[in-house]
Amino acid sequence: MICKKASSKWIVLVCLIFILLTAVCASVVYGYTGTSWRQVYQAFTSFNGTNEHVIIKDVRLPRALVATVVGASLAAAGALMQALTKNPLASPGIFGINAGAGFFIVAGSFFLHIQSPQALVWSSFLGAAFTAAIVYAAGSLGREGLTPIKLTLAGAAMAAMFSSLTQGLLSVNELELAQVLFWLTGSVQGRSLDLLMTMFPYAAAALVICFFLGQKINLLVMGEDVAKGLGQKTGLLKFVMALCVVMLAGSAVAIAGPISFIGIIIPHFARFVVGNDYRWVLPFSAVLGAILLVCADIGARYIIMPQEVPVGVMTAIIGMPVFVYIARRGAKL
């Protein structure tokens, strides 16, 4: 733990928020079409309809905001899952929640011809909730009850199954294959503010709720018996935490597709900075997750310019070595 005093944690958090704002501004400025900081300022103060101004306001700004919200949502969901399951490798991606949400979106589009953003968000929520329930039930089977290793294995099985089913549906409808495949790799390109505003209320509500649960989560992590002895309603708390995970992961997948590794690695960085106090781990995870995804999106524009790498590929490149390190180190919550 780097920051031991509350004052130092506040200072670091404010600095991280400033870094996030800087990264968002950089995301609006830099890309294939050359623009300057001056043009960005003019686009918001004296918009004149030029190509650069349109790109800044209608393409890059929504993209930066989407990356911010999605990164914060996935990181906070990962921190909640690691506390809920007592598994340092837990995340919406590893437990199959992202894959389940993605499958329900593709299935809804294929069978029910769902097109509206609101319907896509609810399809994603339904898939995330269904997958979470199945993984939890499968992980609870056997004499030992719920264990981290069984949860991980059940999640991996569900992720593989839903990924296979999704690919099967896409192979039948080849006309939409290219666009949907780009979405399934995880991307914030081409997302509109209207789509963001459709999912933002759910993600914002879940973030606010989980921030207020920090102290209760601290007691739960100490042990369920300890939490019950201190008057904690552990069943209700777990339900609310699971609901927040579904809302955060479901809304993120609905707008950006299944982006992996943010939910795994970011909570560990947050705990490295502020320790195991979830009053701080959750907000730090949200800000760090937003920073990572915004910066990864900027990098994705330059690797094979003029083409773009899906940001999900960038997070996988960054996250895989960290994931292996965490697994070998046997990180503790």
Swiss-Prot record:
GO molecular function, one term: transmembrane transporter activity
Inducing stimuli: Induced by iron starvation, repressed by fur.
Keyword ATP-binding: no
Protein name per Swiss-Prot or TrEMBL: Probable siderophore transport system permease protein YfiZ
UniProt xrefs under Pfam families: FecCD
Gene Ontology CC: plasma membrane
Its membrane topology: Multi-pass membrane protein
Assembly: The complex is composed of one ATP-binding protein (YusV), two transmembrane proteins (YfiZ and YfhA) and a solute-binding protein (YfiY).
Keyword annotations: Cell membrane, Ion transport, Iron, Iron transport, Membrane, Signal, Transmembrane, Transmembrane helix, Transport
Function: Part of the ABC transporter complex YfiYZ/YfhA/YusV involved in import of the iron-hydroxamate siderophores schizokinen, arthrobactin and corprogen.
PANTHER family reported in the protein's UniProt record: FERRIC ENTEROBACTIN TRANSPORT SYSTEM PERMEASE PROTEIN, SIDEROPHORE TRANSPORT SYSTEM PERMEASE PROTEIN YFIZ-RELATED
Transmembrane segments: 64-84, 94-114, 119-139, 152-172, 193-213, 246-266, 280-300, 303-323
InterPro entries xref list: ABC_BtuC-like, ABC_transptr_permease_BtuC
Major localization listed first in the record, in broad terms: membrane
Gene Ontology biological-process entries: siderophore-dependent iron import into cell
Amino-acid biosynthesis listed as a keyword: no
Subcellular location: Cell membrane
Gene from which this protein is expressed: yfiZ
Signal peptide as annotated in the record: 1-31
Knockout-associated phenotype: Strains lacking this gene show a reduction in growth stimulation by the iron-hydroxamate siderophores schizokinen and arthrobactin compared to wild-type.
Family stated for the protein in its record: Belongs to the binding-protein-dependent transport system permease family. FecCD subfamily.
